Amino acid sequence: MTTIAPPAKVNGRWPQLSLLGGAMLVDNTEASLVSSLFPVIRQSLGMSLSALGVLTAASKIVGVFTGPFWVWAARRWSRKGVLVLATGLWGVWGIAAGFSQNFEQLLIFYTILAAGYAAAHPIITEIIGDLFDSSARGRAVGLLYGTIALVGSVLGPIKGQLSNVDDGWRWGLWGVGAFNVLLGLAIWVWFRDPGTGAAERQLADLDVATREAHAKLTWAKAVALVRIPSFAILLVSRLLSGHLLVGTFGVVFLVDVYGFSTAVASVVLLPFGVGYFLGNLVGGFLGDVAERRSPRHGLVAVLQGAQFAFAIVAFLGTQFDYGDIAVFGLFFALMGAAQGVNPGINRPIVMAITPPELRGAAFAIYISIFEAIGWAVFSLGAGFLGDQLGLKTVFLWVLVVLMLVNGAVLSLLYRCYARDVDRVQHELDARRAAALHGQVTDQGIG
């Protein structure tokens, strides 16, 4: 008789994913409101272009500290409780930001707001790994991020129209902040945490206490994550992910470089979001197919190809003046599609090379720390260098050259990814065997 359970399907996983996606959508909408309306905020509060870099960098840097804290708190108390507080009720700070009278006040409130929202990505992504098994994670992640981008893209032009309303950016912050509080209450009422390892074939049919036996998060375990070769390569790649700059400076780029108004430039957010949505769906589907057909190299090949594709499209879409917002919208859609492939690939890769109880910590390191550092450096650099050299030159080096380097770095995954996946599977097999014999083992990941 086999000791391995069939692939698990957690009951109610898609409705739960929808609820978590709603929370991430509102968080992202409020976080992007300042960047998309920065031209009018700049006029309202008398700021320079570099102020956008400072605001974005501060919001990312604070997440370096609070993201891991929220993951620890979720392990110490409850993932649901942390999400209710940090991604829901925390919206009151967005309301406060809407009352800012100068740059300093906006910086303080916006940074506090970001400190709470840093909980969303690592904890929610960890939960996805517990809701879906490896054969469906790509589609789940792709659908989640894609839908968020699609709805966000529809809201993008609407947010842009707030620039035509007196103090429209303030009304935007107030409205989204209030809605975020309501989403927090919805999570409190309807969300059901599946528990650690609920979708792993080796652990799904074990009782909760047995699955949670390894859930304690320690510094030793967290530090051991960076010794996983594939994870270390992904961290370096995240620091080279120049495409992150598009979401922050895309509208400002079109305003400053090609002379469009804020309202007109904001139109590209719709095709960008649609492209990102389709890229997520295609990326998630390709990821699951690649995982089945080539478990050793499939995901890596798709991820690498997405980086090269983005660099080519970014060069064509940012370095030439087409004089028509529709043409720029087309290229932004293609950039969104190439960028959208990433979540449905890199998140499942991280899940595959880390045991269930450490995925939250892994995503805190990957997203809250390394992605935040990269985003902060890009935003600060683009803000200050944009004032000196112009955003067109900055976009060439960050969106094109750096992304080509990123794709080359990912080639290193071909040597170690399969080995790291096998290591995790052997550990889970050992845990199941020990559980069936009434024992608990913790062989670790190093």
Give the ranges of each region predicted by the language model.
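Juxtamembrane intracellular "pre-TM" segments in multi-pass secondary transporters
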Residues: T2-V10, G195-I233, R431-H437
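Residue-level signature of mid-helix packing/kink "hotspots" within the transmembrane helices
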Residues: S32, K60-P68, A118, S153, ...
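Extracytoplasmic gate region of multi-pass secondary transporters
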Residues: V34-S35, I228-L281, P343
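Conserved MFS/SLC helix-loop-helix module at the cytosolic interface between two early adjacent transmembrane helices
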Residues: F65-F103
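Structural signature of the two symmetry-related core transmembrane helices
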Residues: G81-I95, H297-F315
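Helix-loop-helix hairpin linking two adjacent transmembrane segments in secondary transporters
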Residues: L144-G195
